[in-house]
Amino acid sequence: MDANTEHPAVGYGKLGVLLVNLGTPDGTDVTSMRRYLREFLSDRRVIEWSRLFWYPILYGIVLNTRPRKVGKAYELIWNKDLNESWLRTYTRNQAALMAEAFGGQPQVVVDWAMRYGQPSIASRIEALQKAGCERILVFPLYPQYAAATTATVNDKAFEALLKMRWQPALRTVPPYHDDPVYIDALATSINKHLATLDWEPELVLASFHGIPKSYFEKGDPYYCQCQKTARLLREKLGWPQDRLQVTFQSRFGPEEWLQPYTDATVERLAKEGVKRIAVINPGFVSDCLETLEEIAGQAAESFHHNGGEKFAHIPCLNDSPEGMAVLNHVVRRELEGWL
């Protein structure tokens, strides 16, 4: 049998790295926002309520009210030069910079995807396989593990394999909340940005995205990993506990979420006479709606409205040299045995 004529022409011998973040709408218009929110809020990992209870609320109320409101919030922080969200911009940049870092190893192919929206995880896994990747490392861009973030990325990646006759081998990246390179990068970022201020914050809030308290009670390790990140960061900075305080943001719905809440804490501190604070978001790899609009925008406004005077938002690691050092370090570690 002539292999050149009887067998399909396929690439082989390459390793894929797929960076995956949460997702982004294609635009700020109502239609784009509704499409994005429908996919996001239909995920059973995100909303664990019974579908019989949740879907009437989702389709009857949420998708008729929130798209316009959330769209206006996105408009405030939209990357107008590229007509896209900053999360898309940063994730694409991270993939491009990582590809450059592996420039001397052409067998490594780096790509990026979103859990919700485009480009989809399934489309990029298929593209990597067509590019000759027999093995793919899926990297959920979340330092701390949560079922609503890391697990749903992994779910979607393995779901993509269900439709493939010839499946690539798949690995997933574990959480790296206590990795020394990550902690060092956060400490460097804090010191670097505080040095640019002509004032010193009385304290810094480490604001993590929240999850319902019930998820934690069911065994989700997220809360513990956030606390460990903060503890290690304090130790690296040489700060006491009250100098770097943990809070949780972005609460949605009527359930109790992890506390203390960031918004309530910011308001309380201002009312208690604290005049200068800074906020960092250690759990976000890239700046996005939750950091740029909710913290740099809403939280800053609340602090000033309630008597605070100086507020600083410390940017996420994004595609900075420190941020890329973390991502490249984690990927090289997880490729061991393959590369």
UniProtKB/Swiss-Prot annotation:
Its main location: cytoplasm. InterPro entries: Ferrochelatase, Ferrochelatase_AS, Ferrochelatase_C, Ferrochelatase_N. It comes from Rhizobium meliloti (strain 1021) (Ensifer meliloti). Pfam families: Ferrochelatase (PF00762). GO terms for molecular function: ferrochelatase activity; metal ion binding. Catalyzes the ferrous insertion into protoporphyrin IX. One of its GO terms (biological process) is heme biosynthetic process. This is Ferrochelatase. Fe cation binds at H209, E290.
